[in-house]
Amino acid sequence: MKNLTDSFVYLGHWPSAGSFGFNTDILATNPINLSVVFGVLIFFGKGVLNDLLDNRKQRILNTIRNSEELREGAIQQLENARARLRNVETEADKFRVNGYSEIEREKLNLINSTYKTLKQLENYKNETILFEQQRTINQVRERVFQQALQGAIGTLNSCLSNELHLRTINANIGMFGTMKEITD
């Protein structure tokens, strides 16, 4: 306590204001200087420090608000993306099902058209075979007829005389003429 009262006593023996100098007595001047410096710092620095802290607080709050808004926007975008993904997956499933149905339908159409084509080819083959059989039969008939005719002509030529032959030809021509008149 004596030290405390001694410091006030020293205040009474303050040096005159006329001289300016550097006080080297650290123990005597330090608490007073420190209290004055702290007092000035507290008095003037309090407002500046409050302003700095308020500005920092506002920036932090703004950053938090912006982060919250960005988070809400990101959550909304995520929900929208999930909804679009569900829609795309649903449509992909529809396309997949429709694709399988379309493939089955095309497969059946291809099988049916191939069956029809094979049936037509079978019919064409049968018609061609029938046509070739008829043509071959007609050719055989024609050859048989020509051979029979040539054989008959040969037999007639050997059996008939020229005069008999001419009469037979004239009689046959007459018969053909009569038949022609009847048919006309």
Swiss-Prot record:
The keyword Ion transport applies. GO terms for cellular component: chloroplast; chloroplast thylakoid; chloroplast thylakoid membrane; plastid; proton-transporting ATP synthase complex; thylakoid. Keywords: ATP synthesis, ATP-binding, CF(0), Chloroplast, Hydrogen ion transport, Ion transport, Membrane, Nucleotide-binding, Plastid, Thylakoid, Transmembrane, Transmembrane helix, Transport. The chain crosses the membrane at residues 27-49. It is found in: Plastid, Chloroplast thylakoid membrane. GO terms for molecular function: ATP binding; proton-transporting ATP synthase activity, rotational mechanism. Its main location: plastid. It is a single-pass membrane protein. The keyword Endoplasmic reticulum does not apply. It comes from the Eukaryota. F-type ATPases have 2 components, F(1) - the catalytic core - and F(0) - the membrane proton channel. F(1) has five subunits: alpha(3), beta(3), gamma(1), delta(1), epsilon(1). F(0) has four main subunits: a(1), b(1), b'(1) and c(10-14). The alpha and beta chains form an alternating ring which encloses part of the gamma chain. F(1) is attached to F(0) by a central stalk formed by the gamma and epsilon chains, while a peripheral stalk is formed by the delta, b and b' chains. HAMAP family: ATP_synth_b_bprime. F(1)F(0) ATP synthase produces ATP from ADP in the presence of a proton or sodium gradient. F-type ATPases consist of two structural domains, F(1) containing the extramembraneous catalytic core and F(0) containing the membrane proton channel, linked together by a central stalk and a peripheral stalk. During catalysis, ATP synthesis in the catalytic domain of F(1) is coupled via a rotary mechanism of the central stalk subunits to proton translocation. PANTHER family: ATP SYNTHASE SUBUNIT B, CHLOROPLASTIC. In plastids the F-type ATPase is also known as CF(1)CF(0). Belongs to the ATPase B chain family. This is ATP synthase subunit b, chloroplastic. It comes from Arabidopsis thaliana.
